[in-house]
UniProtKB/Swiss-Prot annotation:
Expressed by the skin glands. Keywords: Amphibian defense peptide, Antibiotic, Antimicrobial, Disulfide bond, Secreted. InterPro entries: Antimicrobial_frog_2 (IPR012521). It is found in: Secreted. Antimicrobial peptide. This is Brevinin-2Ra. It comes from Pelophylax ridibundus (Marsh frog). Disulfide bonds join 23-29.
Amino acid sequence: GILDSLKNFAKDAAGILLKKASCKLSGQC
């Protein structure tokens, strides 16, 4: 349903943000 789609979208967005943040913190961008 719509809620599941939103949950998946939020998970993907959070994962991308976490990857970018960890990459900047480790200086490996």
